[in-house]
Structures are given as C-alpha cells and as structure tokens.
Amino acid sequence: MEWNDAPQLDPRAVQATSVSAQDENASSQEPQALKITAASSNPKMFTLPWELPLSQWPADLFVNLPRGISRHVVRFVHVGDEVYAMKEITRQVAEREYELLRRLRKLELPTVTPIAVVAGRHDANGEKLEAMLVTKHLKFSLPYRALFARTLRPDTAERLIDALAVLMVRLHLSGFYWGDVSLSNVLFLRDADAFSAFLVDAETGDLHGSLTEGQREYDIDLARTNIIGELMDLSSGQLLPTEVDEISIGNRLVDRYHSLWSTLTDVDKFSPDEMWRIERRVNRLNELGFDVDELEMKTSEDGRRVLVRPRVCLLYTSPSPRDGLLS
C-alpha cells in the first residue's frame, strides 16, 4: 500500500497502531498514542481529526441522518465511501461493546456491524479525550422517534413492538442478556407492511451459554417499563396517534414475547400415530424464521405419548412480525 498519496495525517498517527481484535494485550492499559483496534485495517481512519471532541469535528465530515436518543455524543461520519456511526464512551466500555457485537454478529444475530475502537485520543494540549466505538451505519434504518415524526399508520407502535419481540426472543435464545431493552436501543428496517428490529446498543449486555428464566423476565419487565415511558414521551410531544394506549402497547410486548417463546421452546405431546404433527411444528418454526437443528424425542412412561422438543437455530434472514404468530 502506498502512503505517499494519503491525506494529511494527525501528527499522533505516526505513533499509532492498528491491531487485531484478538490482541490479548489490547485492553490491558490506556494507550499513550492513538490506537485503532479493528478486525481489518482502513488507512482512511487515520485521517480523521481524532484530536478533537466528536462534537467539534468539521461539519463536512458529518452525514445528516436521524439519530436516536443517547446519553453519549453520537455522530454519523463519512469515512471514504462508507458511513460510520461514532460514539464517544470510555475505552473499557467501547472495547467490551465492540467485542460483544463481534460475537453477536458471528452468531448471525440482527445487530449493527462493529468496525473499530479508537483509543489513546488526546487534544492539542495533550489532554485525554474519550475513546470511540465505531459501527457501520445500517442503511435505510430509522430510530423509532424518526418513524413517528412521519405520517404513519395508527398501528405503527404495535408493528414496532412485534419486531422488538422477535429480536428479544432471538437474542435470548442465543444466551444474550440485554440489560437495557428499549426502543431507543434498536434500529428498525421496513419489511413491506412490517418492520425488522436490529440491536444497536449492547453497552449493558452480556453473552451466556443460556439464560435463566429470571434473566429473561427481567429483560421483559424492563422492556415493558421503558417502552411505556418512551411512548408517553412521544405522546407529550404530540407524535403519537391519540388512539394509541401506551400501557396496552407495553403489555403487548410481554404477550408477544411469551407467545413466540412458547412456540419455539414448548414440548409437544401426541400419540405415535400423530407423527405428522412433527412436520407441522417444523414448518411453523420455519415460517417464523427459525430452523430446526435437531429434535429431542422421548416416549412417556406408559409408551402412549411421544414428547418432542425442537432445538432451533436462527436463519440469517429476519422473520417478519407479520408472519403467522405475529400477524
């Protein structure tokens, strides 16, 4: 690669490094020089004004896209031909969220794509600046507030909740404990008359082999509380149709989640001459966007009943909330 024709670099980039995310020492201590941790190198990243707080970057770098509510400074930035979302947070949180998003992507779960962690940032006076988590902008996606700012059908809130229920079940089946479920931490893509939901903020999350019922129920209860609050906020800003009942929408998430979870995990019981019901159950799961990895089959003690529990894996394409159960 020829660097002679590269744009002017930040002076600190001379000492900077771009390392693999698998570097065991990557998070051991605060870097003294600019350090970009990424799965693959992108020299254009070094040309950005890392010596400035994100809010003070030149306006011509920014892309005017709808942003959700965040407790951090977040901007969309042109990096070559790509558009990246930049979020200023502490180095430890940035590195943890980056690795977690990478693991979720490897599981083919619907999340934004992590690009890099940028640490070792200092201003012109040598004062430390917060690190940045860089993710790829999800094309055509919108945060929930941007959707409600448009003229939409009165049942938009219900369709968003249905999409969020599917996302939560997918994440929970893979052992992901969210810890901060809300509409603000999700991006939505239109899917004909429905929506697909994507995880955008994994700051408080954690990945386990499996989740306990208590962990799942905590996520569900928190989601209900947050959603009701977010919808009430929209209502106070006159962005929510008057016929929408915020509490009913929050309760809808709980009902949809439990219905889908039951469909995916319950044990079927039937007599040996009703084996056709296995195929119907498998087809039903396929329609919802889940593939059956294997079937666990047992007979009852008296031998009169067959017990079947499917073990599912996730198809890459997101199931539409309008399909079957969530119609």
Predicted features along the sequence, with ranges:
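Active-site activation/catalytic loop segments of kinase-like enzymes and analogous catalytic loops
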Residues: 184, 216-243
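ATP-binding glycine-rich phosphate-binding loop
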Residues: 48-79
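Conserved kinase catalytic-core helix
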Residues: 150-179
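ATP-binding glycine-rich loop module of kinase domains
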Residues: 73-98
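Catalytic activation segment of kinase domains across protein kinase-like and atypical kinase folds
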Residues: 184-222
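Juxta-kinase regulatory segment immediately upstream of eukaryotic protein kinase catalytic domains
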Residues: 2-57
